[in-house]
Structures are given as C-alpha cells and as structure tokens.
C-alpha cells in the first residue's frame, strides 16, 4: 500500500514537472511563432516599399521620356524653321554641270586657236550682245529740299494781288484801282458806258448813306438833294414831309 502510494506520489511528482515543461514548450512555441511572424511582416513591408519605389521610378522614367520627346519635337520644329529660313542657292557652275558631273572645258583646238590669235593680234574681240541702256532713276527729294520749296510757294501766294469779291466790303466805299478800270472804251465815250457790277460793299455803303439822309430830312425838314440849285430863302417856311411819303420831290444822286 505504501509502495503504491509512493509510486503514486512519484508519478504525481513526475507528472507535475511534465505539465510545467509542456507549458514552457508551448510558451516557447508561441514565442517562436511570434518571432517568425515579426520578420514576415517586416519583409512584406519591405516588399511594399520596394514596389512603391519601383512605381515611382517608373513614373519618373515615363516623365523623363515625355520630356525628351517634347524637347526632340521642339528641336525638330526649330530645325525645320531654320531649314525654311536659310537657303543657300547653288552656283552657276553647279546648275550648268552636265550629267557626268564635270565642269565645262573648251576643246584643246579652240584653246590653241585663241592663243594664236592673242599672239598675232594681241587682243581678242569680245563677242557679247550690248543691251540698250535705260535712263537713270530720278532721286527722291530730301526733306530739306521740300522744306526749302514750301516757303517759296508761300511767298508767291503772298505776292499775288488780292482780287475784290462781292463779299469783301468796308464801311466806306473803296475807289477802284487803275488795274480794274476797263481800258477798252473809246476816247470819246463817257465813263458811264462802262458795265456796272453789283458789289456788296457798294450796296451797304448806299444803304448807310440813305439812312443818314433820311435822318437828316426828318431832323431838319429839308432835302439836301433838292432840285433847285439855289438855297432856300430864310423867309420861306421849311418843307415838311407828309406822313405817307418821306421824299416829296425826286432827288438826284
């Protein structure tokens, strides 16, 4: 009985450390799992970062390619523009070159003949068509010449005599100049035979004179242009004009 109990106690004592060892092993396994999980998470993060960096690098590469394409297009356009702007024409020799590409050369017999002519005559006759000459192009007037001509034209205009017109008038009648008198009349004819012209200054002066005469008649009661050459006697009464007519008798002007 004691052995059994003792054996049981031994088994119980041995079972207790086994259970503790299991807990320890399970704890170690859990730690191992945690340890193994840590590097996997970091590796996944590293992979994601690597993928992101690769994508960014790809984007930068695509941007660089686009920039290169744009610069190449601009350079091509500049080259095309320069090719259109700059044009170097070929020389006459290049235009006149034959199909074989060799320049023109006279035959040896012609060269010999020309040298013989030079030796005998000393000069060669120029065989060329002389074109007719045209007159030289007149030079354009400069600003100084134009400015010199303008004062002369103004002086000529100022020197021209002023011709009277119907609208040129003064307060007093203007006596006609000798240049305006008609000289085609005969010596025996009177001055009244001249053609009379209506002028505005003459009309205005006549109106002014008539107005003065009417004022004089109304103020004094006498007509200055009476038919009688003798003056009125002091005993005779002054002439009065009626209300209907201001001029009772005809006047001579």
From Swiss-Prot:
Q: What ranges does the record give for the region Disordered, renumbered to this chain?
A: 1-108, 126-253
Q: Give the sites modified to Phosphothreonine.
A: 137
What is a biological process (GO) this protein takes part in? DNA recombination
Checking InterPro entries in the record gives: PA1
Region (Sufficient for interaction with ESR1) residue ranges read 160-253
UniProt key word Aminoacyl-tRNA synthetase: no
Name the domain of life this protein comes from.
Answer: Eukaryota
Ranges where the record places region Sufficient for interaction with NCOA1: 115-159
GO CC, one annotated term = nucleus
Q: Name one GO molecular function term.
A: nuclear estrogen receptor binding
Record's keyword annotation contains Ribonucleoprotein: no
Pfam families the UniProt entry points to? PAXIP1_C (PF15364)
Where is it chiefly localized? nucleus
What the protein does comes down to: Its association with the histone methyltransferase MLL2/MLL3 complex is suggesting a role in epigenetic transcriptional activation. However, in association with PAXIP1/PTIP is proposed to function at least in part independently of the MLL2/MLL3 complex. Proposed to be recruited by PAXIP1 to sites of DNA damage where the PAGR1:PAXIP1 complex is required for cell survival in response to DNA damage independently of the MLL2/MLL3 complex. However, its function in DNA damage has been questioned.
- Record note on quaternary structure: Component of the KMT2 family MLL2/MLL3 complex, at least composed of the histone methyltransferases KMT2D and/or KMT2C, the common subunits ASH2L, RBBP5, WDR5 and DPY30, and the complex type-specific subunits PAXIP1/PTIP, PAGR1, NCOA6 and KDM6A; PAXIP1 is required for the association with the MLL2/MLL3 complex. Forms a constitutive complex with PAXIP1/PTIP independently of the MLL2/MLL3 complex. Interacts with NCOA1, ESR1, NR3C1, AR.
* Name assigned to this protein: PAXIP1-associated glutamate-rich protein 1
Organism equals Rattus norvegicus
This chain is encoded by the gene named Pagr1
């Amino acid at each position: 009985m004691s052995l059994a109990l003792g054996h049981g106690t031994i088994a119980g004592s041995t079972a207790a450390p086994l259970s503790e060892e299991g807990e320890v092993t399970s704890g170690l396994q859990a730690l191992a799992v945690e340890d193994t999980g840590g590097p996997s998470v970091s590796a996944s993060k590293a992979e994601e970062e690597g993928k992101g960096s690769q994508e960014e690098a790809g984007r930068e590469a695509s941007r660089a390619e686009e920039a290169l394409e744009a610069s190449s297009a601009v350079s091509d356009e500049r080259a095309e523009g320069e090719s259109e702007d700059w044009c170097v024409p070929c020389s006459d020799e290049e235009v006149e070159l034959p199909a074989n590409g060799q320049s023109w050369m006279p035959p040896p017999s012609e060269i010999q003949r020309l040298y013989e002519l030079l030796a005998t005559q000393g000069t060669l006759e120029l065989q060329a068509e002389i074109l007719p000459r045209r007159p030289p192009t007149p030079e354009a007037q400069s600003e100084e010449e134009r400015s010199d001509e303008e004062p002369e034209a103004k002086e000529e205009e100022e020197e021209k005599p002023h011709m009277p017109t119907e609208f040129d008038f003064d307060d007093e009648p203007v006596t006609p100049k000798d240049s305006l008198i008609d000289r085609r009349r005969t010596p025996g004819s009177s001055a009244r035979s001249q053609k009379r012209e209506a002028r505005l200054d003459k009309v205005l002066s006549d109106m002014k004179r008539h107005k003065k005469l009417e004022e004089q008649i109304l103020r004094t009661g006498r007509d200055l242009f009476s038919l009688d050459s003798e003056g009125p006697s002091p005993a005779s009464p002054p002439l009065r004009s009626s209300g209907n007519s201001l001029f009772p008798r005809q006047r001579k002007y």
